[in-house]
Amino acid sequence: MLAYWRNMGSKRNNIKRYGLIGRNISYSFSRGYFKQKFETENLENCTYENFDLNEIEELNKILTKKNIYGLNVTTPFKREVVPFLDRLSPTAEKMNAVNTIKFHEDGTVSGHNTDVYGFEKSLLEIISTLPKKALILGTGGASSAVAFVMKKLNIEFSYISRTA
């Protein structure tokens, strides 16, 4: 479990480290986005790093680093990270997929899936009448969140992708 590693961190300095875990993530805009966000919000003690992993087991190396407060999770580790966590939010548990990891003061680590919330909220803000059918473009990590929302809203859907 990640709680062991969280407790290994020192709170001597007040730098709060956040980051993204995934594979082949050099393309990700997350580091730049959060760097700008931290600057805008005058959060001088926060940093955001990309942690490019080949295998989920490499996560343990990251967790020995000091002052990790949260991680975003991307492909292909959204499902693979679940066994490493102490608890899951209800949505993450239903999906068996996590895109956000929170490190708590008590040393425990929780997993959340914000893809579902974000997609559902965005959809309901722009569409007043829900369709009966939908087409999901792609079968990547976020497509499972879109499908989850489609099922929840009773919208019939199909996938289309290069590999499906």
Give the label of every model feature segment.
Residues Y48, A134, F157:
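Hydrophobic anchor at the start of a short beta-strand
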Residues K152-E156:
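Conserved S-adenosyl-L-methionine
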Residues S10-I127:
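Phosphate/diphosphate ligand-binding glycine-rich loop within oxidoreductases
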Residues G22, N113-V116, L123, K132-K151, ...:
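Glycine-rich adenosine-cofactor-binding loop
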Residues F157-A164:
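Anionic-ligand binding region
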